[in-house]
Amino acid sequence: MGTVFSRLFQSVLLVCPIKRVSIRLGSYGRCATQRYFQVLGNIHDIELNESLNSPQAIQALSFGQLSVILLWLAAYTFHIGWSGNFEAFIDNPLGVQPINHFVLDPHYSQYKVDTTIAALANHPIYHWLMTVGFTSNAQIYRFTLGLEITAAVMLVLSLAPSVGLLSMGGLEVVSWISICWAGHLVNFAPGAANLTNVVMEGPGSLGNLMNVLTFNGGIQLDTQALAVSDVAHHHVAIGIVGLWISALLRVSKYAWNFNTQSSYHLDLSLSLTVGGILTSLLAQQAYVYPALSYLPYDYLATTSLYVHHQYIGAFLATGGFVHGGIFLVRDYTLSNDLVGKLLATKATVISTLSWITLFLGFHATGLYMHNDAMAAFGVPQKQIIIEPVFAEFIQQVFFLGTPVYGLGSAAVSSTPTLSFLPIISGGDFLVHHAIALGLHTTVLVLIKGALDSQGSYLFPDKQSFGYGFACDGPGRGGTCDISTWDSFYLAFFWVNNTVAWFTYYFHWKVLSLWQSSTAVSDEDSLYLMGWFRDYLWQNCAALLSGYDSLGSNDLAVWAWAFLLAHLAWATGFMFLISWRGYWQELIDTVIYMHLKAQARFIGLAADVVTPVALSIVQARFIGLAHYVAGFILTYHAFVVGATS
């Protein structure tokens, strides 16, 4: 743990353009810019960075992370029991607004404390606690204690003797926990009593037992959520599939590893990619088939849950491609296996994806620009509106298949709070293809970066330069910005913007459904000005009037956060556009004046301060962090202001 904190402290110091000679330099040299570039370029070499020379030590890092996550969850649930209103919420889930915790900031007035407490509750934790059977704060405290004990167990598990045992045994443990959780839901969750009665009516009948574990419940009209039997069936299925996969892994001896040497980056790449896909699917399922009781009545929590999981899913999937590229650079030797065959056909893969993105880009943006021009020229009847025929056909298949799936009529009908199969329009057709453009472009950048990580027609010996490098000198023109790290850097902007597109679309769609104004959104989503005017600008109104010279309202804190996040987002562009040169001159000038005045700078003697500049990689990294964090926090405040 000390090594981890030491590395974290050094990384923080390395970001600063001022360094102290007394810092341990290692083999990276005296120049802070060079040292930071080397650390950043090798940050994924966990064996070197953390001085780890055994698989068990590397595996211990994962369990340490799980322990920290469990402790964070324990603190969260403790505060709900200590200063929340959970017991009042379960007595009247439709009339009581759940709160997070008290605000102890002395700068808040009592009025602002009261309004901010309610406004902060944009999460479904209360709904989950009620759905799984919690009925009192005392039970929440016991659950918190259980989380803390489990966190301690995670640290003990890091001492296991075999990584293979941890990997396969961990999958088995998760599978059995999933099956046991299904049993907990059937016996203790609200509404489970009728399920127990079904089994007890005919304990010797297999049919009665299967009735508990099928999709016969559907959406309940009172809670607007799936029946407990559906959720229990889901967890039983997950457990059985997990046990089956674990058995396959034991038999195959990790033969799925493409006959390559063991690679942590390959394992992590596959895990991140699958995890990203499942997380994105969960975002869709949480709205269409909500598993938490009364969640659809809470519009803000529903929207936040969707946006939260879409961002996590996109970032996990991006990380999967990144670690796949690191695997090819560091751990893979070209051979006639599955990976080698993929690399042999990379030109076909990259060119095909390129043509797809060009087709989507020209057609989707071209349609939007045409429709904007027609609306601006006063002839909106000349807009191109394409009927989503294929999507309508898919919806009809769902309706026809209702008896087969056994979902029940409530599952496929619109309600005041959710719509399983909403009516789609030409605007939906356009935005779906715009989202497809963003997704395919992101995948193109990531796949190209990974498949070209060992070498390309322009740069055949790229692998010898490592995962990240700046340029290979003027003698090899075009070798700048083509490392695998650079592809991740570019793709992260694309994936951030793509997630914004489909969260914008989801949010506007559900807002129009909740407000019964679908006709307006269907018409105005056909052109870009409609998106800006009727979604972004119109829904900013509540935040923009959060506080003024006459006072403030209950959204004032979020209006302030909206402004602050905008500033962080804009700061990102400053670093992205103005790289090494500007900061070099600025820092040199500042250091010169301090040395000339014989001043002490940040408590250090003048003779131990060396002026250095931000490298291109430094500025890109800092700019990307500001851009993404500012963008997400800006949208967070926007969702609260527009939905609440």
Curated annotation (Swiss-Prot):
This is Photosystem I P700 chlorophyll a apoprotein A2. PsaA and PsaB bind P700, the primary electron donor of photosystem I (PSI), as well as the electron acceptors A0, A1 and FX. PSI is a plastocyanin/cytochrome c6-ferredoxin oxidoreductase, converting photonic excitation into a charge separation, which transfers an electron from the donor P700 chlorophyll pair to the spectroscopically characterized acceptors A0, A1, FX, FA and FB in turn. Oxidized P700 is reduced on the lumenal side of the thylakoid membrane by plastocyanin or cytochrome c6. [4Fe-4S] cluster binds at residues 471, 480. It is an enzyme of class 1 (oxidoreductase). InterPro entries: PSI_PsaA/B (IPR001280), PSI_PsaA/B_CS (IPR020586), PSI_PsaA/B_sf (IPR036408). Keywords: 4Fe-4S, Chlorophyll, Chloroplast, Chromophore, Electron transport, Iron, Iron-sulfur, Magnesium, Membrane, Metal-binding, Oxidoreductase, Photosynthesis, Photosystem I, Plastid, Thylakoid, Transmembrane, Transmembrane helix, Transport. Its main location: plastid. It comes from Amphidinium carterae. The keyword Transmembrane applies. The lineage of its organism: Eukaryota, Sar, Alveolata, Dinophyceae, Amphidiniales. It is found in: Plastid, Chloroplast thylakoid membrane. It is a multi-pass membrane protein.
